[in-house]
Amino acid sequence: MTYNIVALPGDGIGPEILNGSLSLLEIISNKYNFNYQIEHHEFGGASIDTFGEPLTEKTLNACKRADAILLGAIGGPKWTDPNNRPEQGLLKLRKSLNLFVNIRPTTVVKGASSLSPLKEERVEGTDLVIVRELTSGIYFGEPRHFNNHEALDSLTYTREEIERIVHVAFKLAASRRGKLTSVDKENVLASSKLWRKVVNEVSQLYPEVTVNHLFVDACSMHLITNPKQFDVIVCENLFGDILSDEASVIPGSLGLSPSASFSNDGPRLYEPIHGSAPDIAGKNVANPFGMILSLAMCLRESLNQPDAADELEQHIYSMIEHGQTTADLGGKLNTTDIFEILSQKLNH
């Protein structure tokens, strides 16, 4: 079998971190004996510059045919038209592929807790996953309008939309430490009242999982004061967007956090959670670990290569533990150095 992978380098540092990761994929495929082919497509701001839109039909159709999609990063201050922004391409891609699940793990690597802005004793041993609903909620709700006197956004969820994301979260929790935290604002939001009701109903199907509920403001506090208490967190789109960015700083850098977005079937999208960082683009100083860890998720979930994923992750964790990092993590290596060291480790 030959896996079909679509590569979307995007904008800013996206091309340099994705292209380096693809060089690692070539080494890994030879070592673990599997075949793949890559289709490169412009996406986001780069696509706007070339084609006048952030996501062309050609690119979308290629993504629909793919086994996996690897995305570098998109966006930047260059693209200011509110009706034609790079981010709109990503929203359209998620909606078109029905990528309703977003998985964002946060892990504090052994021996690297000193990198966190929080006290070491608070973060050491943190290993949590945020499961974010990705295609509904206030980012997609209708009606919406804006003028100089009034603005309206609609936060809408159906029972079916809540059920499907909650089932994913329960199954993930059951495969880990058996604890699920559901985040809402049930005391004031109608959508959260339905959310909590559905979570409680679905919980009856997963007796092996312990469930607790937290208001989103309380959860944001507990993520900082005691992140080790969490196993799996499930939340709606807006809350998940905010909480996952908050959680990403716990290990010490946005550059350490991967993510995967998927549906019940079809291709999965893998990307680091950081932005395109146009201020450092092309300077060979970007931290590529988030992109490489996203590749590891792709190896495990879409390419059926769990051993390769484990090896890649362990090499990264070892590098971080021994201070072989870029400047944002206190190290002295550049982007190319990271890929060269990992290439040597994988070839060993």
Curated annotation (Swiss-Prot):
Its EC number is 1.1.1.85. The keyword Amino-acid biosynthesis applies. Mg(2+) binds at D217, D241, D245. Transmembrane segments: none annotated. The keyword Metal-binding applies. Its cofactor is Mg(2+); Mn(2+). InterPro entries: IsoCit/isopropylmalate_DH_CS, IsoPropMal-DH-like_dom, Isopropylmalate_DH. One of its GO terms (biological process) is L-leucine biosynthetic process. It catalyses: (2R,3S)-3-isopropylmalate + NAD(+) = 4-methyl-2-oxopentanoate + CO2 + NADH. GO terms for molecular function: 3-isopropylmalate dehydrogenase activity; magnesium ion binding; NAD binding. Its main location: cytoplasm. Substrate binds at R94, R104, R132, D217. Homodimer. This is 3-isopropylmalate dehydrogenase. It comes from Staphylococcus aureus (strain NCTC 8325 / PS 47). The gene is leuB.
